[in-house]
């Protein structure tokens, strides 16, 4: 399609899924410049924008980079709203017409020449571009193998101009500032490409032994030898700048080494293409320890056969994370997300744990809650692994260590008090999906040698939550709860969390129910009574007349209340008060109205409002974040997902649909352009502060690391379609929005397949469920047989 600006009202001229839903295309590099896609494998991940910028990291075992900024970078985690600039790491291909001197670049950066046609295509298995300049079509494809940290690039140049063309092609992969200790770059004929070498900086002797096996080389290998090369960034760029490098303007690259200069990887190929002729080039780009590893990677991958074998293996790897539901509804965008992209994102989180060695405990448990629907055995193992690090007090650590030698880093060095809450939440979902009640009796041994059953460890965790309360019965917050940067409410040891108080009630409620269903009546009674006590404390101390306060500071100041000019109302306490049964009918009506009036935006409900505009030092650093960004009043999709789940739990189907649909770009062009997000993932937030900063409200963070996805997948399965495990049965209690006349679902559940047709019938007053033509009086499917297919007809009131 033309790369010109899209038509104002036809979203399909800007972006659209392929017919089979396996890919999503964007037809402009300028309308949504930060939109893109991501790939990962067991060792690495790479996020690519439609314009060619890239952010990549691999594990050794901690995250590391092989393409760097051109200046000294601080080590950090994946960032929301990653800023891009001319010298940002990327993967670029310059194309020069040798007869006219015209210069282009693909995908779009750095030359930024307008293309005749442009298509960026995010796929499940690879990322592609198809760009046409002056009759020359350049097709790029990047993919990953399953187990090695290497990018596999294919570039096809096709002459569609109708005349013979003389061209030069220049793959240019900047390497950046690798190290202040040692960095270099040069061409290796023996290895077949450019190899850049460095030493990760260190000063302590112990670090030498820890780092000596690091992959400190970065390579760009070619299948076909080039006519020339450059390995020095400044020599390549020269006086022309990246948009017109001096080396590219010359007849031939200068074969420059980099000797303690910023290295780069640039190759030159000369092409003479007859009309309709095409040439294909393949490259491998990534990190390595030494020449032997580089040579092995070249032998393994750098051929047509190697690329094909890697693609086949990677497709099988992703197949292991296929979803358990396929849907057909009146909303095609929802269908595409749920059928293709949402389970992929859930799998990414649970399979590689966000590519970290110490995931936050809450993230680890929620990510693996999602895996309960894709790979239940993996989810089970994650629960047992997490509990193996439980403290003798019953508390859970701030992070879960995944490999030997891993340490708690960054936010995991800050004490938070919510981690025990997520254990029964995980179990509630896991048991409903699998029926694996035997896990409750599984024995888990901790580092101190103590061996206890899962059930006993949950008892201890729930008791820890009850003990970690003040005299009023409210939960201490320390330096944060789910909201990490709420770090100054209770740093002196007195402040309490309103959210954690009702979340504790919800956790106790779930665990009491699990105990009751599994013959643990004494514990069910004990924790059931505790639910009533915690809820009573929340209503006595936190109810502000129309909604629940967010907390009470060390100095006894309630916040998140009507008297506050900023941060007047927070979403999370309201959502979890619904889940915990804290709010009675009158309170429920009041808080739902308050959320709609004060938190709703066209892009979903914000996390708090109004956003803070200055530091409030009895709340914490979240108030220093930009208004509407992240925890300071963004449409923070993880919190939105909690609210969505709570709405389904109280049976508010239409309000829930409104919230669910707002997570997706569109359906109109203006909404999609404002968000700038390609719907191949759910981002961790869209900008908030809609009333304060409307120009940027709705803008996507583009960050695909988010606890949102497991909850949204659960909401679709168990809320929207109501297909949820209940003991040994599958319950059917759908909550379709009232304007949907019908929907179809194919659900995999406990080894059986359920083909469900849902129809809304005018005049009907009661839900009816037929299983293979026979009415089910309790709207459940009993006696499920693995391997069997069940036909369900579900008739909903009109």
Curated annotation (Swiss-Prot):
Keyword check for Glycosyltransferase: yes
Entry annotation: catalytic residues: 484
GO-annotated molecular function: carbohydrate binding; hexosyltransferase activity
Keyword Transferase recorded: yes
EC assignment: 2.4.1.321
Keyword annotations of the record: Carbohydrate metabolism, Cellulose degradation, Glycosyltransferase, Polysaccharide degradation, Transferase
Pfam families, sorted: Glyco_hydro_36, Glyco_transf_36
Pathway(s) annotated for this protein in UniProt: Glycan metabolism; cellulose degradation
Organism domain of life: Bacteria
GO terms for biological process, alphabetical: cellulose catabolic process
Reactions catalysed: 4-O-beta-D-glucopyranosyl-D-gluconate + phosphate = D-gluconate + alpha-D-glucose 1-phosphate
Family: Belongs to the glycosyl hydrolase 94 family. Cellobionic acid phosphorylase subfamily.
Reported function: Catalyzes the reversible phosphorolysis of cellobionic acid (4-O-beta-D-glucopyranosyl-D-gluconate), a probable step in cellulose degradation. May be part of a metabolic pathway where cellobionic acid is converted into alpha-D-glucose 1-phosphate and D-gluconic acid to enter glycolysis and the pentose phosphate pathway, respectively. Produces 4-O-beta-D-glucopyranosyl-D-glucuronate from alpha-D-glucose 1-phosphate and D-glucuronate with low activity in the synthetic direction.
Subunit relationships: Homodimer.
Protein name in UniProt: Cellobionic acid phosphorylase
Lineage: Bacteria, Pseudomonadati, Pseudomonadota, Gammaproteobacteria, Lysobacterales
